[in-house]
Amino acid sequence: MAKEAKRVRRSERKNISSSVVHINSTFNNTMITITDSQGDTIAWSSAGAQGFKGSRKSTPFAAQVAAADCAKKAEEHGVRSLEVEVCGPGSGRESALRALQSAGFIITSIRDVTPIPHNGCRPRKRRRV
């Protein structure tokens, strides 16, 4: 029997005017996800997906490149205004935000949603360099 050809699911163009940007900036990488108001992903990118490897992923420039790529993908879906949610302690937070602003989006709000423990779990041991 002949193999059935795989169907490639093509992402149809959604017409979304406002959306939410989640910038997750860790010490090792920066992930940017653009979702609609329900939380369905429109576009995503990360420093690692842009070809940065190792310690270069954690740089502000890598976050800027990832944010610019994500903005280009979101523009194809008609996104104009953004709400920004920033999470994590990494170095790519501000540069990713600046890259989204320079891409021509209207930023309506910026929220820091970094989880802060109220004396919860014991933290990992301190690094001694």
Swiss-Prot record:
One MF term in the entry's GO annotations: structural constituent of ribosome
Gene Ontology biological process terms in this record: translation
UniProt keywords (A-Z) are:
Ribonucleoprotein, Ribosomal protein, RNA-binding, rRNA-binding
Q: Which Pfam families match?
A: Ribosomal_S11
- Entry keyword annotation includes rRNA-binding: yes
Per the record's keyword annotation, is rRNA-binding included, yes or no? yes
**Taxonomic superkingdom:** Bacteria
| Recorded GO CC terms | ribonucleoprotein complex; ribosome
Q: Which segments of the protein form a coiled coil according to its record?
A: none
Assembly mode: Part of the 30S ribosomal subunit. Interacts with proteins S7 and S18. Binds to IF-3.
Function (record text): Located on the platform of the 30S subunit, it bridges several disparate RNA helices of the 16S rRNA. Forms part of the Shine-Dalgarno cleft in the 70S ribosome.
- Say which family it is in: Belongs to the universal ribosomal protein uS11 family.
Recorded protein name is: Small ribosomal subunit protein uS11
Q: State the species of origin.
A: Bartonella bacilliformis (strain ATCC 35685 / KC583 / Herrer 020/F12,63)
| Gene name for this UniProt entry | rpsK
